[in-house]
Every structure is written in structure tokens, then in C-alpha cells.
């Protein structure tokens, strides 16, 4: 009797579809990919169950075309977690399972990492060959000598030896002095542990000691003020996990936090580290995914989708900035990476640490009801002190493109004292939208009805909701007037005002638009961390987790935008953003100051932030 197999395929299907087992092939197992027919198409799906019961007559079922994997890509626990997630978040099961895979696996490519050419010294090579080559082919002699010393050469090492090194090596291969072979290349970053561990203070030591990899499941909230050394707590726990041969999964909310965390982990850990986020190529993401699955990576740092990466020897999960809304997938298969991380840690029976300076209200409620262990780091590490916070009353104040005279005065004062200034506005673009001064027409997206953001540099209107773009109209579509004006403030508009007011001061703007090119964010952050840019302007990309030791003033340009939003979480998120961005000030020896512009200085939320933190 032919076996019936349930396969989850991408599409609007609440449950897996029934297929007959492939002929002349071993029976595919749950977690394997298969190629199946669906209508006139052929799709990549994933086997969910092999002992399936079906009410459909077998002659009406189609057969699986072929099995794409020799072993399950996803283990039973992770498969069950993704299926549970699809049901919980009311999403088609096939879409959820397939979206959990790297793009190349979704497309049906082999589950193998990239190949790297390795050059090795041939057994026939002799020292006398080297002497002969020095006279006739000095370049080949240099490479042969290198091989005699190190035995092997990788492509990365070869790239540092000059443009003609590969051609010279090929000649050595032709002469029988060297051989080549292909090896798997996972793209791992090696930690060199060049920096000694910091001595933990009492609060850090208590928090770190509570995280026990290899000793069962526990949920711990590491509730530490900005600059309190939460990362040191993570590093202590990760080091102990590595010593036990266990892997650690670290989830971060933003791509921008990955380079800084990776650099710090490399300096402190003697480990193989993989990174997974959307800024990598498809091949790089597949390599990282496979490295974690094969146990080649000791630590995996990733954004929210990394929660679905299989782990060969799981020991610890860390969710940094657990409160952050970026941990929630907002389109396609919608899910909360933090909540799924907690569930996955429970299924794997490993501890999970949730870190934040501004925990979400639901996490605080769980901690106070003792569902989570609550560990507080209430003081900044080292000699750093909490910044002085003040409100700048905007009522009746003349402004220059949203910048009040008191804020401009504080910026100038800190620049004169050789300080670094960070100005925060959580709205990219030149202005939120365009308005007609004659009739009040507003630029709305014709696809989704959201307001279209005005980008002056590109001379375009861009919908940040559905990604639609269009040219700026020459006249009002409603009344024909040519008096179209930008309405409200965006980072591009503030940048223009700052360049006019502080023309001789190096300025860096960091938002999603200015960091689209690969590596641009890292370059801009390095300039900021070295103090080369004295004025920093940015959105929430700058507010989270970055160590900027020379920032002495943080200015919040528009606190009011979060006070009266329709979202019931708007006040909570405003408080979190202000506290997070305020934490960038005064992180080293010099004291910090935070200036918050508002038309509502008496608002209870702002008063609580200023006086109660």
C-alpha cells in the first residue's frame, strides 16, 4: 500500500496537503524538503507527517516528485514549534514553515555551505625545487616557501598576497608542487579572546550566576539601566555555556546592533561566531544557518528570524532589548520573536535571559508575579553617572526648523567644550508629508491610504508603509495650486538646518535612508564612536544599545509625537525611547545631559521620566 504523506506547501492552506510517497526513493521524514505538484506548478514543501490518515481516495492523490534532502533539516522540536506558531498567529502552516528557512533552501537549492578552494603543499615538493624557482620564477618561489611554512593557503590569505598570486599558484599546481581541494566554508568569525574579562560588580555577579546553562529551564529578566553592563552579564554566561560545549542564541532587535556586539564578542570569546540578518547575501545567510545546525557555530547572533534556526547543542538563549517592537515581525508571517524565544527555551529546557533598560509592561508583570526571575542592575558600571535630564518648554519659543533657542544654546555649549552631541528624531525623511497651502490637500498613498513621506534629496514621495514611491507633483491634484509645502519635521530637514547653523561641525545622519548601502552603517557608527563626527542626528537606530563614550548631550527634538498617539502603547514606547536615547549620554568620565523639547512640560509621563526615571 502506498504511504500517504502530509506536506506543508506555501499558499493559503490552513493545514498540510496529502501526497503519495515518491516512487523509487526512500520515504521522506518530517523536516525534509520535497518537491511536489500543485495545480500546474511545482513547489518546494516540507514533510510534516509520514503516517498520515486521509479521507481522500489514493487514486485522487498526486505523488511527491522527489525528496530534496537526505536528512531532516529541522528537528522534531523546532518543527512542532513552528507548526504551533502558525496556529497561534493564524497563519498558513506552509507559509510559516517555508519562511523559517533561508531563501536558498526555499528555492530548492542543496543544503550545503559555500565551497572554498584550499591550496596545499604537494608531497613531491622539495627544498631543492625552491632554490631552482628563486632563479626562474621568484613569485612562484615566494608562494612555495609560504606553503612549506604553513602547509595550506586559503582564498582569504591569497587575496592579501597580490593580484597575480592565484595565477602563480596555478603554475605551482601544474608543476606538481601544490594541490587544490574544495572545503566547506561557513563564513564563521573566530573569536580571539584578546581582551580579558571585566571584574563584575556584585549586582552583575548575582545576575550572571543565576544564568545556568546546562541546568534546565529558567526565565530571567536582566533589568539594568543603560550603561550598567548587561553585556558583561551575557558574556559571563556565554563563556560558561561554551566551556560546557553548548551553543548560545543571541537575538537582537536591529541589524545595527550586530556589528558592535560581534566585535565585542570576538574580543572576549574564544569561539566560532555566526551572524544572521537581512543585510547579508542569501549565501551568507544559508552558511550561518547551516553552521548553527551543524554545531560549527558556538554563538549565533541574529535578528528576529534567527529564532527559527536549528541548533545542534543548544544551551542558552538571550534576547537583548526584549521590549523592542522590532522583535515583532510586522508583515507576512507575523510573530513575536521574544515570545517564541521563551517558548523555544522551555521546549529545549535551557535558560533564557531577557535584557532591557526599559522592560515591557508585560515582562515586568511576569517578573513581579514571580513567573520570571528579576535581576536588577540599578547603577552604571565603572565611574559613569546617570545624565542630568531637563525639559525645554517650547510654548511661545521661536524655533528654527524645530530647534528651539535653548536647545541650540545647549548644543553650542557642549560643542565648545569639545563634547559630542546626539540629536534624536524618530521620523526619517525631510518631512512626514506634503500639504497644499491653498486647500489643505495632503499627499496620501493611492495604494494603502497612508501619508507619503517627502524625501527632498531624492525629490520623491515614499510610503513607508507599503513602499510605494512617486515623483513630487508640480501642482496640487485637488485645486491646482503650486504652493505645496513640507508639513512637519524629518531627519533630512533637521540635517539641513544643522548644516546651516553649525556649518563647521562634522555631522553624521543615521537613519534607514542614510544606511541603505552595505557597510554604510558600520562606517558611520565607527566615525561616531571615534569622535570624528561631533554632531550625530538619527532615529531609533541610534537609540538602542550603542556605546558612544564621547556623547555629552542628547537632545530629543520632538517628545510630543508619542504623547497623544492612537496606539495604546504609545506612552510606553515614548518612555522607552527617551530612556534608551538618554542612556547614550555620559557613558564615560564626562557627565551627560539630556534636553527634551516639548509643548507639554507638565505632562505626567514626562514629569515621571525627569524625576523618577
List the model feature ranges, each with a label:
Residues 1-356, 363, 368-384:
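Accessory, non-ATPase domains that flank or precede helicase/AAA+ motor cores in DNA-metabolism machines
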Amino acid at each position: 500500500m502506498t504511504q500517504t504523506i502530509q506536506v506543508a506547501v506555501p499558499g493559503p492552506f490552513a493545514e498540510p496537503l496529502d501526497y503519495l510517497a515518491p516512487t523509487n526513493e526512500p520515504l521522506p521524514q518530517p523536516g525534509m524538503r520535497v518537491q511536489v505538484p500543485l495545480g500546474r506548478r511545482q513547489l518546494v514543501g516540507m514533510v510534516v507527517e509520514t503516517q498520515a490518515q486521509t479521507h481522500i481516495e489514493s487514486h485522487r492523490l498526486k505523488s511527491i516528485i522527489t525528496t530534496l534532502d537526505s536528512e531532516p533539516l529541522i528537528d522534531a522540536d523546532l518543527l512542532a514549534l513552528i507548526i504551533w506558531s502558525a496556529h497561534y498567529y493564524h497563519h498558513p502552516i506552509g507559509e510559516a514553515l517555508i519562511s523559517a528557512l533561508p531563501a536558498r533552501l526555499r528555492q530548492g537549492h542543496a543544503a550545503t555551505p559555500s565551497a572554498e578552494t584550499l591550496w596545499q603543499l604537494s608531497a613531491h615538493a622539495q627544498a631543492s625545487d625552491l632554490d631552482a624557482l628563486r632563479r626562474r620564477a621568484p613569485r612562484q618561489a615566494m608562494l612555495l616557501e609560504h606553503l612549506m611554512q604553513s602547509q595550506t593557503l586559503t582564498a582569504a590569505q591569497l587575496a592579501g598576497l597580490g593580484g597575480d598570486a592565484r595565477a602563480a599558484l596555478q603554475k605551482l599546481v601544474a608543476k606538481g608542487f601544490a594541490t587544490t581541494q574544495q572545503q566547506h566554508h561557513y563564513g564563521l568569525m573566530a573569536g580571539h579572546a584578546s581582551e580579558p574579562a571585566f571584574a563584575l560588580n556584585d549586582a552583575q555577579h548575582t545576575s550572571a550566576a543565576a544564568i545556568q546553562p546546562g541546568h534546565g529551564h529558567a526565565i530571567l529578566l536582566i533589568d539594568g539601566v543603560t550603561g550598567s553592563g548587561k553585556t558583561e552579564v551575557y558574556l559571563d554566561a556565554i563563556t560558561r555555556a561554551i566551556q560546557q560545549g553548548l551553543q548560545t542564541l543571541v537575538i537582537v532587535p536591529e541589524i545595527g546592533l550586530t556589528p558592535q556586539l560581534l566585535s565585542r564578542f570576538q574580543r572576549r570569546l574564544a569561539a566560532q561566531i555566526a551572524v544572521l540578518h537581512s543585510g547579508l547575501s542569501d549565501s551568507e545567510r544559508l552558511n550561518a544557518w547551516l553552521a548553527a545546525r551543524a554545531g560549527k557555530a558556538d554563538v549565533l547572533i541574529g535578528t528576529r528570524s534567527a529564532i527559527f534556526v536549528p541548533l545542534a547543542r543548544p544551551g542558552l538563549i538571550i534576547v537583548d532589548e526584549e521590549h523592542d517592537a522590532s522583535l515583532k515581525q510586522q508583515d507576512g508571517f507575523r510573530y513575536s520573536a521574544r515570545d517564541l524565544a521563551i517558548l523555544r527555551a522551555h521546549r529545549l529546557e535551557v535558560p533564557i535571559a531577557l535584557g532591557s533598560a526599559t522592560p515591557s509592561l508585560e515582562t515586568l508583570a511576569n517578573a513581579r508575579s514571580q513567573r520570571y526571575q528579576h535581576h536588577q542592575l540599578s547603577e552604571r558600571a565603572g565611574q559613569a553617572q546617570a545624565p542630568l535630564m531637563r525639559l525645554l518648554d517650547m510654548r511661545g519659543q521661536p524655533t528654527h526648523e524645530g530647534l528651539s533657542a535653548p536647545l541650540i544654546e545647549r548644543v553650542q555649549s557642549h560643542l565648545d567644550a569639545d563634547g559630542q552631541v546626539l540629536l534624536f528624531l524618530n521620523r526619517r525623511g525631510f518631512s512626514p508629508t506634503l500639504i497644499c497651502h491653498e486647500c489643505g490637500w495632503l499627499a496620501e498613498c493611492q495604494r494603502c491610504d497612508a501619508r507619503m513621506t517627502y524625501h527632498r534629496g531624492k525629490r520623491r514621495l515614499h510610503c513607508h508603509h507599503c513602499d510605494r514611491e512617486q515623483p513630487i507633483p508640480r501642482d496640487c491634484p485637488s485645486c491646482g495650486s503650486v504652493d505645496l509645502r513640507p508639513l512637519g519635521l524629518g531627519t533630512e530637514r533637521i540635517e539641513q538646518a544643522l548644516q546651516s547653523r553649525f556649518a563647521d561641525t562634522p555631522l553624521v545622519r543615521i537613519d534607514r535612508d542614510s544606511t541603505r548601502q552595505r557597510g554604510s552603517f558600520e562606517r558611520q557608527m565607527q566615525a561616531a564612536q571615534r569622535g570624528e563626527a561631533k554632531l550625530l542626528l538619527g532615529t531609533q537606530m541610534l537609540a538602542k544599545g550603542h556605546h558612544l563614550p564621547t556623547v555629552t548631550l542628547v537632545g530629543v527634538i520632538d517628545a510630543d509625537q508619542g504623547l497623544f498617539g492612537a496606539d495604546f502603547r504609545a506612552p510606553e514606547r515614548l518612555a522607552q525611547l527617551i530612556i534608551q536615547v538618554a542612556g547614550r549620554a555620559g557613558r564615560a568620565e564626562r557627565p551627560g545631559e539630556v534636553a527634551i523639547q516639548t509643548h507639554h512640560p507638565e505632562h505626567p509621563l514626562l514629569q515621571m521620566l525627569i524625576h523618577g526615571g
